[in-house]
Regions:
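Peripheral, non-AAA+ core regions of ATP-driven protein-machinery
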Residues: 1-102
């Protein structure tokens, strides 16, 4: 299952659009974030999981979660991607209704 969310990263004072794609597939459980991310973004996997569970929502068990932050050439820094990552994961698990045509 695949779900997308859109956010922005600041490059200097310029906002740059970032697409957050969460892909869930059966297999060995894991959580990977790809797309030129710094350490704070890599640690988002722990914050996102804690937030989802704390909100009494279901965390996908027995699934491999891959989150892609695109464009890959743009460096993503900080914890500002936690919410869009959470929304993309929840969308991929169908816990959020899909939205069309934004």
């Amino acid at each position: 299952m695949l779900a997308r969310a859109t956010t922005h990263a600041l490059v200097g004072l310029e906002p740059r659009r970032v697409e957050v794609e969460a892909h869930l597939q059966p297999g060995v459980p894991g959580f990977a974030i790809v797309g030129l991310v710094d350490r704070a973004c890599q640690e988002a996997k722990h914050r996102v999981r804690s937030g989802v569970v704390s909100a009494a929502l279901e965390w996908p068990l027995n699934r491999r979660i891959t989150v892609n932050l695109a464009p890959a050439a743009l460096r993503k820094e900080g914890s500002g991607f936690d919410l869009p990552i959470s929304l993309a994961v929840l969308g991929a698990t169908r816990q959020l209704p899909p939205e069309h045509g934004v």
